[in-house]
């Protein structure tokens, strides 16, 4: 098969692992930056064409047909990346995570709405409109509370406010820069630990527990946390699978937290990193992803 990965940083561990796994299984893989794509819509066939400019001085060339597309772009490329994905969808190409599902996952508030709508447990959460005074949110939030930027990643834009007035001050400051923030109950009993599940299709293929540094409430590895192996029950795995389906994804990193009221879903990531979870779990996730593409791209072609 001829595969395409949409990614701005081809040297990243995850991109290299996926390319190696594809090559090992006899496939070609191109890695291209979605921000260098030119999309063309035509009334007459071919209706969907995609051109690519290698650099600022080169002439854009027409991309060939691909058997499958893997989106691995970051939050700064979401809009263009999803436009490119949608173009491939228009061409009938199999995409590992559709554009709408990708957009769902990148919107933290919409994700929570979709999860709760389908019965997936999430922390109590709160979002106020731009004309609502921050002070008016105090009766509706717990203390301490977590504040999150709607499009943050890797723990960036996540703040712990110990007191209600601190939360108000933070919200007022961000409001000045037109940045909306959602508020969530702080799950104190979980300490500084959470769980990452890697879901492919109908299976949880790998898990790990993430533990934040001393004095750090965020468990993200990018914030200096450590990881450990963890075994989940079948019921806990089902929550991660249901969360993935609620967002509409084929492949996802689902972040879970254990609370006194049971397991809760914190977030569903459409482009989860492979490095820490492969090294912690010992699972060759890259090969599992290529296996999944082989099966589903073939079904898509029939």
UniProtKB/Swiss-Prot annotation:
Q: Name one GO molecular function term.
A: ribosomal S6-glutamic acid ligase activity
Q: Does the keyword Hydrolase apply?
A: no
Q: Which UniProt keywords apply?
A: ATP-binding, Ligase, Magnesium, Manganese, Metal-binding, Nucleotide-binding, Protein biosynthesis
Q: Name one GO cellular component term.
A: cytoplasm
Q: Relay the cofactor remark from the entry.
A: Binds 2 magnesium or manganese ions per subunit.
What is this protein called in UniProt? Probable alpha-L-glutamate ligase
Record: residues binding Mn(2+) 1: 255, 267
Superkingdom per UniProt: Bacteria
Per its UniProt record, what PANTHER family does this chain match? RIBOSOMAL PROTEIN BS6--L-GLUTAMATE LIGASE, RIBOSOMAL PROTEIN S6 MODIFICATION PROTEIN
Q: Does the keyword Protein biosynthesis apply?
A: yes
Q: Which residues bind Mn(2+) 2?
A: 267, 269
Q: Which cysteines are joined by disulfide bonds?
A: none
Question: Which NCBIfam families is this protein grouped with?
Answer: rimK_fam
Question: Which cofactors, by name?
Answer: Mg(2+); Mn(2+)
Annotated residues that bind Mg(2+) 1 are located at: 255, 267
User: Which residues are noted in the entry as Mg(2+) 2-binding?
Assistant: 267, 269
């Amino acid at each position: 098969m001829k595969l395409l990965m949409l990614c701005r940083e081809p040297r990243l561990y995850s991109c290299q692992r996926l390319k190696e796994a594809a090559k090992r299984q006899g496939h070609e893989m191109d890695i291209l930056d979605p921000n260098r794509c030119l999309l063309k819509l035509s009334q007459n066939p071919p209706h969907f064409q995609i051109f690519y400019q290698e650099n600022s001085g080169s002439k854009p060339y027409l991309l060939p047909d691909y058997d499958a597309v893997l989106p691995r772009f970051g939050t700064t490329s979401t809009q263009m990346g999803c436009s490119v994905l949608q173009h491939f969808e228009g061409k009938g190409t199999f995409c590992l995570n559709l554009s709408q599902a990708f957009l769902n996952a990148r919107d933290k508030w919409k994700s929570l709405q979709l999860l709760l709508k389908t019965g997936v447990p999430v922390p109590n959460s709160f979002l106020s409109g731009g004309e609502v005074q921050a002070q008016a949110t105090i009766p509706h939030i717990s203390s301490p509370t977590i504040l999150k930027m709607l499009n943050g990643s890797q723990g960036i834009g996540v703040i712990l406010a110990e007191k209600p007035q601190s939360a108000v001050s933070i919200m007022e400051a961000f409001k000045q820069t037109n940045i909306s923030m959602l508020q969530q109950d702080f799950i104190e009993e979980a300490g500084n630990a959470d769980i990452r599940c890697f879901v492919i299709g109908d299976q949880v293929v790998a898990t790990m527990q993430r533990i934040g540094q001393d004095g750090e409430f965020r468990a993200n590895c990018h914030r200096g946390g450590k990881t450990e192996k963890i075994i989940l029950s079948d019921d806990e795995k089902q929550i991660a699978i249901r969360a993935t389906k609620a967002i509409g994804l084929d492949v996802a990193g689902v972040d879970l937290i254990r609370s006194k009221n049971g397991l809760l879903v914190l977030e569903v990531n459409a482009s989860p990193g492979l490095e820490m979870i492969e090294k912690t779990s010992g699972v060759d996730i890259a090969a599992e992803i290529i296996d999944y593409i082989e099966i589903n791209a073939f079904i898509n072609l029939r």
